[in-house]
């Protein structure tokens, strides 16, 4: 749990340092603004947990942080902006988790397995945020390029680790293809969605469904065995 628990502090520190690097120093006013923004996002998550992700009420969010709604717009100019900031926060947090898992294991299949396991731990710990990140639960919401960037960086980490697994003959090269990685992510997303739908409120360690991840990854690795012929491919020809 240490990886997940350290994320909030590290994200705040990242924002803090970003302002410092831009302006040369962080003033008390800037620090207060950053803290207030984070408090607003925390309150938004709490409201979404109670009322539904798509039912975010900014009046209620403002009340919980001691602001009037017009004052909240000094920090976020719309409800969409709050969703966008939460989306960016979530994928930044997930990127930190992937980085810790993959670099800590030195890449390769063991690192990918740990990264997928920590991804499910994150989703179980942050079910409301996970809905926003991986489903289209808010009609019309499209994340900004900036908010989506951390998701793409995380995917690049997985691609690199999967390529290393293929180079080390831990998996067949087809596993490191775009289709192979898409299949891996679909497998993990399936376990996550089953847990979310059928075990609301059940933690990572207690979940019967999350426990299916390890055998599912075993089956994936067996399917993409490095013992298969190099030219083997599971994908239907498009010719």
Language model regions located:
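Basic, helix-initiating cap at the start of DNA-binding domains
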Residues: 1-51, 55-60, 64, 81
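Short, structured helix-loop boundary elements
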Residues: 37, 58, 80, 84, ...
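Key DNA-contact positions within bacterial/archaeal DNA-binding proteins
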Residues: 70
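Short helix-capping/turn signature of helix-turn-helix
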Residues: 76, 135-139
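Hydrophobic alpha-helical connector segments
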Residues: 85, 99-128, 151, 177-184
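Helical hydrophobic small-molecule/effector-binding pocket
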Residues: 113-135, 156, 185-192, 196, ...
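Hydrophobic/aromatic-rich alpha-helical bundle segments in the mid-to-C-terminal region
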Residues: 131, 144-148, 152, 166-217, ...
């Amino acid at each position: 749990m240490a990886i997940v628990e350290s994320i909030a502090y590290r994200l705040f520190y990242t924002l803090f340092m970003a302002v410092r690097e831009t302006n040369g120093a962080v003033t008390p006013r800037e620090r207060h603004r950053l803290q207030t923004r984070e408090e607003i996002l925390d309150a938004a998550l709490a409201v979404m947990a109670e009322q539904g992700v798509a039912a975010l009420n900014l009046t209620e969010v403002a009340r919980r942080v001691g602001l009037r709604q017009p004052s909240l717009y000094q920090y976020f100019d719309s409800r969409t902006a709050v969703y966008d900031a939460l989306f960016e926060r979530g994928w930044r947090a997930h990127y930190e988790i992937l980085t810790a898992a993959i670099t800590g294991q030195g890449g390769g299949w063991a690192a990918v397995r740990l990264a997928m396991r920590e991804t499910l731990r994150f989703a179980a710990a942050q079910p409301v945020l996970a809905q926003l990140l991986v489903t289209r639960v808010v009609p019309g919401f499209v994340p900004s390029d900036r908010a989506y960037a951390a998701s793409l960086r995380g995917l690049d980490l997985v691609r690199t680790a999967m390529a290393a697994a293929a180079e080390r003959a831990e998996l067949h090269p087809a596993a490191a293809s775009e289709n192979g990685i898409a299949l891996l992510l679909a497998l993990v997303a399936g376990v996550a969605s089953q847990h979310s739908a059928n075990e609301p409120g059940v933690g990572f360690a207690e979940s019967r469904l999350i426990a299916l991840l390890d055998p599912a990854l075993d089956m994936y690795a067996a399917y993409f065995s490095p013992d298969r012929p190099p030219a083997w491919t599971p994908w239907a020809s498009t010719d």
